[in-house]
Design a protein with these regions (language model features):
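Carbohydrate-active catalytic/glycan-binding domains of CAZyme proteins
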Residues: 3-27, 31-32, 37-42, 48, ...
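Glycine-rich, compositionally biased intrinsically disordered regions
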Residues: 50-52
Length: 678
């Protein structure tokens, strides 16, 4: 299986600009590019190499791992300096910090940081460039933006001279409008499985998927620093991928790059309506702008007066001193090149819009609003049809959020998936929805905020793996439907490894309890075997290596699958509760997900259990990928059980070295272990 991903990216040419050794500090607000070439990599403590007093500072130094890791603040941990430490644990760095003056908020001046690991981008061998243009604060290396944050506020240089160290060659350019760039492409032999966008610290967050005219569209919130950008407010844009066969993919990059300091995308849906493609999305503007200054306030007043929502143009919002927020949309003729509608149509910040049976549109309003809304046109009028579904927060026994509703119908049954935990199914050809998450009969498997697309009769689910903070790598699944509409979930055949095409390193006809296999922690592996359990059978894989060991267990009697850290790899661990089993322990008065009395739930994608795994009752095939994620230097274990359930566990700070098989009243046969490569 030869998988490819063709990535579109922007190549910048800062080397063509003219640089000098000084700058007018009063023109900082217009932007600046700083060229830096170190005379040698730093070897000691933190040292300033450039400073504009009270505005911008650039420093270099060396972090020593693992000693320094716990002392780092959260943002620096998410720069992944430790991943690029050398054999002695040293990770030289360069960090830039700007001082932003803000109109809103309690803190009138806030410092924003952005760094680079110099073992990855050696600024002593070639120049790196620091860009600030008001909306972007970025490092450029080899012509690409390789790290970025998004400022909110402005720079104001105070009195004092600019400092330039003699340990680096530094040039300054204020003419950032002359920065040339062009679109380039690169094709990689890579699968979409475990994908996380181009860049050493880029991750995929909430997703949108859609299928039309033989093309599958995959839209993902582009993340750096696990929601840490713009002081923890995210500042996400959306990248867009397509495929016709799920094997060969094209990543077109950002649909719309962040251009204003208030912009941060929330997902909605993509749909084809009246001959055009639409991407409905949210703007989380009030993360940085006071609520009385965002467009939703005007739309709410209009709704109170008129009883419906209608579109308000960005120009009208600006005339009222307001910023766009809530639900917005983009439109395209070809499904690839989108332009802004430049209208706010609703207050929902996760507007899931679909075509309805009458040719109009229906919105399942997520985050910022609630209920089901219908309109004859994208611009409205949007009238509320239903206030009961989907439920969230205080109304939900599992405390699911209202994020990213995904609605689909299959053979007369309707389904709603919402946020990290919400899951409902209707009866046959009716709208009598039952909450299946409260009985543990959902399809959550460690993927976060999943959405589903009907791909010509195949129902494809996608989401991101939790456990590393907000956003990480993304995965695809295929749903299977059973009697009564019950759903199962499996790997996509197109993305499932074929052991005959891989390097087999072990084949065992019958696996004895206690038998072990050795693995290399910086390599990915595929394991496949048959399991024949008795009614009270248990099978476990005790996984050890670099970091805390854990046991992956499949319990036929309890019909549960779980992972749990352990100090004893010679035995099964204690039972882990599935999410629904915590409901009786939660307070009667519902408030938030913080009431769940354990971190060992599927929303954290680490140690958790899934229930009602009916595939365990009979003989089944177990498939596991031990994926080594280079960008975070850790293991992600992904399993398919009996072609009907899946389970993904992220193991931060862990690399596999050994697998010990545990069996009780069960047999493991026909095992194959294959190397998939680094």
């Amino acid at each position: 299986m030869h998988c490819t991903i063709t990535e579109h990216f922007i190549r910048h040419y800062p080397e063509k600009l003219n640089y000098s050794g000084n700058s007018d500090k009063d023109e900082l607000g217009n932007g600046i590019i700083i060229k830096i070439r170190l005379k040698e990599l730093p070897k000691g403590d933190r040292k300033a190499i450039f400073e504009i007093p009270d505005a911008l500072k650039i420093e270099t130094g060396v972090y020593h791992f693992p000693e320094d890791f716990n002392a780092l603040d959260l943002f620096r941990k998410r720069e992944y300096y430790n991943v690029y430490a050398d054999e002695s644990g040293d990770s030289p760095y360069i960090e830039a910090e700007i001082m932003l003056h803000q109109e809103y908020g309690e803190e009138k001046v806030r410092n924003m940081l952005l760094g680079l690991p110099l073992n990855l981008y050696n600024a002593a061998e070639s120049e790196v460039y620091l860009l600030y243009d008001g909306a972007r604060f970025a490092w450029i290396a080899n012509g690409e933006i390789v790290n970025i944050n998004f400022p909110f506020g402005s720079l104001k240089a105070e009195n004092g001279d600019i400092y330039i160290s003699d340990s680096a060659e530094i040039g300054i350019c204020r003419n950032i409008k002359s920065l040339e760039s062009e679109e380039k492409t690169e094709t990689k032999n890579e699968s979409i499985a475990f994908y996380s966008a181009r860049g050493y610290n880029t991750w995929g967050g909430d997703i949108v998927n859609f299928y039309h005219d033989g093309v599958y569209h995959f839209l993902v919130l582009l993340d750096r620093h696990h929601h840490g950008n713009r002081f923890g407010c995210g500042a996400h844009s959306t990248y867009h991928m397509t495929t016709r066969d799920f094997i060969h993919w094209e990543n077109y990059g950002e649909i719309y790059p962040i251009q204003n300091s208030w912009e941060s995308f929330g997902t909605g849906t993509m749909f084809f309506w009246n001959g055009k493609y639409y991407y409905s999305h949210g703007f989380h503007t009030d993360r940085v702008i006071p609520r009385d200054k965002v467009g939703s306030r005007l739309l709410e007043k209009n709704y109170e007066r008129e009883g419906f929502f209608s579109a308000v143009t960005y120009d009208e919002l600006k005339e009222n001193g307001l910023y766009p927020s809530g639900a917005n949309y983009m439109v395209s003729d070809d499904g690839i090149h989108f332009v802004q509608g430049k209208k706010q149509i609703h207050c929902s910040e996760n507007p899931s819009i679909y075509k309805d049976e009458n040719g109009g549109l229906v919105m399942y309003a997520g985050y910022g609003a609630a209920g089901v809304w219908k309109a004859p046109d994208i611009d409205g009028p949007w009238k509320k049809e239903d206030t009961d579904m989907p439920v969230f927060d205080n109304s939900s026994p599992v405390r699911n959020s209202s994020e990213c509703p995904s609605i689909f119908e299959w053979n007369g049954y309707k389904y709603i998936i919402m946020g990290f935990r919400g899951y409902w199914q209707s009866g046959f050809n009716d709208n009598d929805f039952k909450d299946l998450a409260v009985v543990g009969d959902d399809i959550y498997d460690g993927l976060c905020v999943p959405m589903v697309a009907n791909c010509g009769g195949r129902y494809i689910l996608a989401g991101w793996v939790g456990g590393s903070g907000w956003a990480f790598i993304t995965l695809h699944r295929e749903l299977v439907q059973h009697e009564g509409g019950r759903l199962g979930i499996r790997w996509m055949p197109e993305l499932t490894p074929n052991p005959d095409e891989l390097d087999k390193i072990a084949e065992v006809k019958k696996v004895a309890s206690g038998e072990e296999l050795k693995l290399d922690g910086k390599t990915s592996y595929y394991l496949e075997c048959r399991v024949k359990p008795q009614k009270n059978g248990r099978v476990g894989l005790a996984v050890s290596g670099s970091g805390k060991p854990f046991v992956f267990e499949l319990n036929t009697e309890r019909q549960k699958v779980q992972t749990l850290e352990t100090d004893n790899i010679n035995s099964f661990t204690e039972e882990v509760k599935a999410l629904y089993e915590y409901i009786p322990e939660m307070p009667e008065k519902r408030t938030s997900c913080a009431q769940i009395p354990s971190e060992n739930i599927h929303t954290n994608s680490h140690d958790f259990a899934i229930a009602n795994v009916r595939e365990l009752k009979d003989e089944y095939t177990l498939k596991i990928i031990f994926h080594y994620e280079k960008k975070s230097d850790n293991l992600v274990m992904d399993a398919e059980i009996g072609a009907g359930r899946t389970f993904v566990s992220n193991r931060p700070d862990f690399k596999v070295g050994n697998i010990k098989f545990l069996t009780k009243n069960a047999e493991i046969t026909d095992l194959k272990l294959c190397k998939m490569g680094e």
